[in-house]
């Protein structure tokens, strides 16, 4: 908030990408670019290509999604965590280990709706491993309010464009356009669980990612 003291710097938490990507790969593998149909369910899934949500396409996320390309959501599309997740959350990962310089970008266009399962502590966590720190070509671009989303780009820049408003964001750099906001609701992240499926979960504990049996 304006006029308040700057928070102390802290080390970004480690992310167990290998384990989370293994969960996605264990579900199913799609070779090539993928554009789901309206009303589709998606996950756990590994996509060897780009993932694009077209205009007006609504998708229910049913597990971890790992994309070895770029992720783009078009206007009036939506991503919603399956209600059966309850208080659990899950991941959408953009990561090509062989090309993190040009691939692994995430673009959330204006008009996209991102929601958890309907439970206060349910979120959709977007992770980019792209290494761009240039705000003109960011690792993650968010051009819309995304109350149910967390965005992470620990090796790149996250750009929040005009009027973007997100739940939480972490990155090597954060670039905010005019009227963009980050509103941390601490109570919603205490003991939050992230799941590859509704039956298994990971928890946030003291700034580390810890598996919970």
Where do the PLM segments sit?
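Intrinsically disordered, low-complexity regions enriched in Ser/Pro/Gly/Gln/His and often acidic
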Residues: 12-14, 84, 118-119, 195, ...
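Beta-strand-rich assembly/attachment modules of structural machines
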Residues: 1-35
